[in-house]
Amino acid sequence: HNFDEVERLDIRIGDFVIIEKAGEIIPQVVAVKKDERPRDAKAFGPPEKCPVCGSKTEKDPAGVYVRCVSTSCPAQLKEKLRHFAARDQMDIENLGPALIEQLVDKGLVKDFSDLYRLDIFALLSLERMAQKSAQKVLDAIEKSKSQPLARFLAGLGILHVGQQSAEILAEHFGSLESLKNATEEELTTIEQIGPVLAKSIYEYFHNPQNLK
């Protein structure tokens, strides 16, 4: 995913590369065996369009990631929902990847709030969904409404906002409404919330798509 590294190492399609473990698990490409490079090895760059929705991509100005910029990309929505429902965020049991796939593909869920509008009839319309399983999903969604603000903020997937910064924001503002109304300048005055993070938070809550 790091095209800066691809360019730095001059990695091409068809190359043989040397890999070592970074940390203890993650494989890291450290060098290219250029003496074994095939004649037809081709250079490549970041994708210009999202492979799922076809929208243009942009490089994260504060990092190395290339992202799809569409707010309606189904692949992005699925990943956002998986993150939102994960154990460390809203902890919605029984809302796994397979179910999320169906909910998005059938148009039943288009944003986080749609999860809380699901009913038994919508779930029973899905493949391999029995009454008992559907009720368990609804019960888990209902239970998630009691999660603390910090977990909810961490679950939204705001760029650069992790669990620690979510807890700082929740403690400082106390409510979602107060955070939504905060200015970018106010956010930058909070300890451990720098300008980049403040800008990301402010822009998230001033995007109409995120306020539905």
Segments and roles (model prediction):
Residues 1-4:
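Short, structured beta-strand/loop micro-motifs enriched in basic residues and often containing a Trp
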